[in-house]
Amino acid sequence: NFSEYMALLSGNTDLLDKAKLEKRIASLEGERKSFHKGRRDSEFKLETKVKELGGNTAAIEAMTEDWNRFLAAARTDKDGNRLNAVRVDGVDSTDEKVIGKRLQEIARNATTGGLYKPIGELYGFPVKVVSERTLKEGLEFTDNRFVVEGNYKYTYNNGHLAMADPVAAARNFLNALEKIPSTIDQYKAKNEGLEKEIPQLQEIASKVWK
C-alpha cells in the first residue's frame, strides 16, 4: 500500500515495519467485522428457521387432529368411497346437483364484506363463503371464495367452485378435506429440510472469532 511504498523510498525500516503492522491490523479488523456480520446473519436465519419449524409442527398437529375428526365422522359407500354429506342452509335436498346449483348462486351473488359467512356444513365442519375485492385487468370485482373450516380453513381450487358443473361444485368441500394428508406431507417435507439446516446454522452461530 501507499505507506509501505513511502517507507521503501525513505529506506527507513522502522517505517516499513510500522506500515506492515498497520496493514495487518486493518486486515484483521476487516476479518473481525466480516466474521461478526456472518455470525449475526446466521443467528437471524437460525431464529427464523426455528420459528418456522415450530409453526410447521403445530400445523401438522392441528391438521392431523382435523383429519382424524373427519375420518371418524365420514360415511362411506359399499366400495369405501366417502359420501358427500354436505348441507347448505335453506336447501332440504341431499341431491348433489340441487346443492351445487344453490352453491353456484351463492358464488355469483354473495356479498359478505370480507367476513367469512357460514352457509352450511360437512361432517360437522362449517362451510363458509367470503367476498373479497380484487383486481383483474385493471378492473375491481368481487371474488367469492369458499372454505371448509376446522383448525384451519381448507380450500379446493383456491376456494373457487366449478361454475359449469353443479355436482363438482357440491363436492368442493369434500375434496378440500381429502387434501389434508397431502398438505401434512408438504409440511413434514419442509421440516425434514429444516432439521438438517438448523444444526448447521447452530454451529456457525456458536463460533468464536479467534
Label each region the model flagged:
Residues 1-5, 90, 94-96, 158-161, ...:
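Secondary-structure junction/capping motif
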Residues 1, 12, 41, 56, ...:
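Detector for Asparagine
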Residues 19-38, 45, 114-210:
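Mid-to-C-terminal oligomerization/interaction "stalk" domains of large proteins
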Residues 49-114, 207-210:
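Coiled-coil termination/hinge junctions
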Residues 5, 67, 99, 103-107, ...:
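Generic structural signal of hydrophobic/aromatic residues within well-ordered alpha-helices
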Residues 2, 18, 96-100, 167-170:
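Short amphipathic alpha-helical segments that mediate assembly, nucleic-acid/protein binding
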Residues 12-17, 41, 66, 77-81, ...:
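Acidic-enriched, low-complexity/disordered segments with a strong bias for Aspartate over Glutamate
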Residues 2-82:
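Long, largely alpha-helical accessory region at the distal end of helicase-like NTP-driven motors
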